[in-house]
Structures are given as structure tokens and as C-alpha cells.
From Swiss-Prot:
Keyword line: Chromatin regulator, Hydrolase, Nucleus, Protease, Thiol protease, Ubl conjugation pathway
Organism of this sequence: Drosophila mojavensis
Family recorded in the similarity comment: Belongs to the peptidase C12 family. BAP1 subfamily.
Site (Transition state stabilizer) location in chain: Q109
Gene name linked to the record: caly
GO MF annotation, one: cysteine-type deubiquitinase activity
Chief localization: nucleus
Reactions that this protein is recorded to catalyse: Thiol-dependent hydrolysis of ester, thioester, amide, peptide and isopeptide bonds formed by the C-terminal Gly of ubiquitin (a 76-residue protein attached to proteins as an intracellular targeting signal)
Compositionally biased tracts (Low complexity): 400-446
The protein's name: Ubiquitin carboxyl-terminal hydrolase calypso
Amino acid sequence: MNVAAGGTSAAAGSASNNNALPMAQLADGWLELESDPGLFTLLLEDFGCHDVQVEEVYDLQKPIESPYGFIFLFRWIEERRARRKIVETTAEIFVKDEEAISSIFFAQQVVPNSCATHALLSVLLNCNENNLQLGETLSRLKAHTKGMSPENKGLAIGNTPELACAHNSHAMPQARRRLERTGAGVASCRFTGEAFHFVSFVPINGQLFELDGLKPYPMNHGCWEEHEDWTDKFRRVMADRLGIATGEQDIRFNLMAVVPDRRIAITHKLKMLRTNQAIVSGTLQKLLKADEQGDDQQRPDTPNTLLEPSAFTARDLQSLLKNLDTEIAINEQHLADENDRRQMFKVDASRRTHNYDKFICTFLSMLAHQGVLGELVSQHLLPTKKISGQSAANRLSKQSSAATANTANSAANATAGKSQPQQQQQQQQQQPQSQAAKNGKSPGKTPGRRRKGRNKCRKRK
């Protein structure tokens, strides 16, 4: 173990000085990383591997073009019943042959919080070097760890300064504070306190391997059929795995694919389209010139680099040229989108890794010094109180308005009910008054009222 760590440290000694990261802090200073494809893509660039990118997989059944491998993020809780089922299932496919293990790159995770880097290296260092340019750091690591045990390979990863610095440079400030507060352990996703873990799925020598740094051995899921791609085998394995893992309705997982850099393929296609565009345009110019001269006997043919030699009319070439122009415009837009996406990865990384604590503390201190902080805090707290008070006031006003409306309705009904009898009584009173006026008597007094008046006068006397 000491030989593996020391050898890698010596090979990368100059890089440790440049990165200013003490070797004593490498083994216990790795920070947690988020599960983000943009972060992983930039991390690969920092490793020195510029021809790959990481994409998130949303649909397992959707075909993926030329993937190097897959990275699976899942919840890691040992006591779960589903977890025990997975362990019992995978124990049957462990590869325990030392020669077979040493022939592939399988490293045990001996450094906490390094599972993201382990997952990426498990994919990249098991790819064919003819199809992928690893870069100086990864090429040196692969050559140095050839034939080592999985434990020594894990120590070599932990003691490589370039990998440690690149890994920690993409961590959020909360990760460092959390490491100082709780210590190292299994990586947790987005700092929620729940443990998550990365594993890799990669094709090796016609067989699908699952490489998990927390397992003692690599797992061989077997070969795929002759008529299918290795990704078909991977889909079946993942379908079974998710069926077991989601037995308790826990579907929190993330799947990412390590694929070639899309910009390289688009750039190559644009180069081919522009070459064909120049050929067709030149042939069309010659054809138009020949038609102007009336030389139909020597009509030019399209070169065999585009199609088989055959006579084309000017209209055919113009239509072909128009299609090429459209394809070029579409691919130029795709290339611009990929470049914008890569730039957005960098912007998100800057926002993710920047420590805003000093700015926030200074800003709040200036507000307090100017005597504005208390007022701002009260203004932001009052709306909540106002909303609760207004809701109560609204309820009271609604109740009072409803009571007032009910009272008004009842009064209106009572008034409407008494209006007809009162009209009849008034009509009856008006008839004797009119008769009394004719007879010369007072119209406003009745016999009963006169008696009451006389009684009152007697009492006064």
C-alpha cells in the first residue's frame, strides 16, 4: 500500500507544488460533489480528458449514441430491506479471480467522498485508448496502477494531487463546512443528510461489468446477445435493479452517460458538408458556364466523392446545394447550442463554488451601520403578520356584512308584509274624516279619544 501511494506521489510531485495542496491532506480532504452532468463534464476537462462529456439520462429506453459507460447514483442505506436483496443478488456475480481483476481497472474507495471521481475513472480507464485520449494525468495513472490490487489502486487515486485538486475545485462551500463539522463518510447528495453513492457500468471484453468502489470485487453481468448492443444488456440489468430497489417506493436515483464530446462529431460533420457544398457549387458553376457556351457534349459530372458519376442538370445541383445549405445551418445551430451549453456549465460552476459568506456579512454590516437593517427586517416580517391579520379582518368583515344583509332582508320583508294592512287602515280612517268634514265636525277626533282626554283632565284636577 505504501509503495502504491509513494509511487504515485513521486510521479506527481511537481503538480502538488503547483496546486499548493499538502500531501498530508489528500487522503482525508476530499469533498462531496453534487450529481450534475455539467460538473462531471468540467471535472473531466480538469483531469485532462477533453474529448468526452457527461449527459443525464431521463429515458432508459431512448437510444444513446456511442456511450463509453454509465454512472448510476442511488441511495446507500445498509439496513434497508431492498439493499439486502441487492447485496444477495450481486454477491453471485462477483469476480474473485485475481488475474481477471488485475486485467481491468477496479479500485476500492479508500478515500471518503471520492466516489464521483472513482466512478468517472472506472469508465475512462477501462476504455480503449485508440478511441479515447485520456490526457497526461490519467494515462500516467493507468500505466502506474497496472497490475495493482484494487486497494492499492484506490490509494493511488487518493494520492494523486491533480485529481484531488480538480475534484475539490468543484465542491460547494457547504461541503467543506460539513466535512469540518461531521467528518468524512459516504457522500451525500446536495447535503440533505441522506447518503448517496456512485457506481459505474462499462463494457469490458464483451461483458458488462459493474464497478463499485465500496464492494470488495467487480461484478460481471455477463455477455450480451450477438444481435444487440451492450446498452441493451445494461437496460435489462437496470430494469431489474430498479425493480428491486423501488420495492419500498423509493425511486430517488440518477443516471448519467459518459459519451463522446458532441461538438467533435458536429464539427466533423460540418467539415464534410462544407466540402460537399464546395464540390457541388463548383460543378454547378461549370455546368452553367457550359450551358452558356452551348457545349452540351462536355457536360461535367459530379465527383465520385459525393455520388456515383452521373449527369446532373442545373436544377438538380441547385436543389442539392439548397439541401446542403440547410444541413449546414442546422448543424451550425447545434454547434452553437453545445458551445452555449458548455459556457453555461462554467457559469453554473462559478456560482456553485463561489463563497458568498463574506459578501453577505459585509452587506449586512453596512446596512446595520446605516441604521437600515432593522427597518428592512421589520418590513419583511410585517407582510406575514399583515397577511394573517388581514385574513382575520376579512373573515370578520364578511361575517358582519352577512349579518347586516340578513337584518336588512328581514326588515324589508317585514315592511313589505305590513304595507297592505296599513294602506287599508288609512283608507278606512279617511272615509269618516271626509264625512265629518261635511257635517262640520272635527275630523281628527274619535269618541274613544275624547273619553281618554276627559279622563286625563279629571285626573289633573
